[in-house]
Curated annotation (Swiss-Prot):
CDD domains: Ntn_AC_NAAA (cd01903). Belongs to the acid ceramidase family. It is an enzyme of class 3 (hydrolase). GO terms for molecular function: fatty acid amide hydrolase activity; N-acylsphingosine amidohydrolase activity. This is Probable acid ceramidase. The lineage of its organism: Eukaryota, Metazoa, Ecdysozoa, Nematoda, Chromadorea. Keywords: Glycoprotein, Hydrolase, Lipid metabolism, Signal, Sphingolipid metabolism. It comes from the Eukaryota. Its EC number is 3.5.1.23. One of its GO terms (cellular component) is membrane. It catalyses: an N-acyl-sphingoid base + H2O = a sphingoid base + a fatty acid; an N-acylsphing-4-enine + H2O = sphing-4-enine + a fatty acid; an N-acyl-15-methylhexadecasphing-4-enine + H2O = 15-methylhexadecasphing-4-enine + a fatty acid. Catalyzes the hydrolysis of ceramides into sphingoid base and free fatty acid. C.elegans contain specific sphingoid bases, which are unique or different in structure compared to the sphingoid bases found in other animals. Two examples of these distinctive compounds are: 15-methylhexadecasphinganine and 15-methylhexadecasphing-4-enine. One of its GO terms (biological process) is sphingolipid metabolic process. Glycans are attached at residues 101, 303, 371.
Amino acid sequence: MKPVAISLSLLLLVTLLPGSEQRKVDNPDFQPNCLVGGPDIYDPAQSEKVLWFDVNLDLPPRQRFQQIAKAYKKEIHAVFDVLNYFLTIIPGVNAWELIGNMTASALDKGMIMNPYRDEVLGIAEVLDVPLGNLVFLNLFYEMSRFCTSIVAQTEDNKDLYHARNLDFGQLFVWDIAAQSWGLTEALKKVSVNINFFKNGKLLFKGSTLAGHVGVLTAMKPHKFSLSMNAKVQPDIINVAKWYMGAYENTDLQFVMYFDRWLFENCDDFQCAREKIAGVKLLTGAYFILGGANPGEGSVLVRNTTSVQFERKLFDGANDWFLLQTNYDPDKDPLFIDNRRDPGNACMNKLTRANVGMKGIFTVLSSKPNLNKTTVHTVIMSVTKGYFETFIQKCPNPCWAF
């Protein structure tokens, strides 16, 4: 088999295993545990454990993320080690090297647009790692995230809160000591917050993982907020075609790079909504969008070319909030991964009168929305400008994913 064929097969393996029903093991018969009404678990001081960095978008692209890479060099190498170890399941094949070489070739062909290309180059210089593997890590985050996102309007219609759990790392090496997934634990240690500046002014705030130049969750204070959840079945065929050069010289966007572009180019909810609806994407996704005005909250279900469906605040039974996991709203979730129903029940137990940083954090700290793959929780208030990130840990007994 030719190297490119081997590499594409490995790519399929790495991206499909986390979402593969065949590889999933039934969760124990744990009952959902909504913490609303119990002891107060919200401690804003805990969010200080996730460090803040400033990224100046007026700097040359290669320099923008280098300070973060320097601060987390050891921890990013640990993420590489987990992926490399996982790929040793294929005997006699250096899978990590093959994937890295193929991704580096895609970069050389100009298949990743600037400024993101040069930003990744700058990070690789600091980390002293193979460029192709770092680029693959950026693409890997594009395809494999299991999350819960919530937007909720307060009872007086004055404030909107937006939050998300980032779930990542299922089936990537069980860490016996930590009683968690090895990749999940490694990603907790590279979770960072960033203030993005342009022309000397704060442009927006975001959370991401050190070594990545996109954003996972972001907010432009007093303007709009966004989180993005992956679909349970990624558009892996499109990714394979991209690797083979089928999308060269097009306006195709990577989702998390597009998220950042959105905050650099939009100044309100409506602009963001229109851009999300019109962009051509490499993979489908769920865009959870919040605004500064009453009722500005939507979940846009995207395929690669258009909006399939949109859910809006005040448009249905749970009209004051929207909760989105990794399944289309009109389809039932996989029976061993039903975070939607327990999450909705916990939000209804919270009630609209208790929507706030504390209340939403409590819901997202409730099982099974909190599980062994939960890396961190981000809570934002568009109207108040709050942005807090909390490293999470799911105590046993806990769902594996």
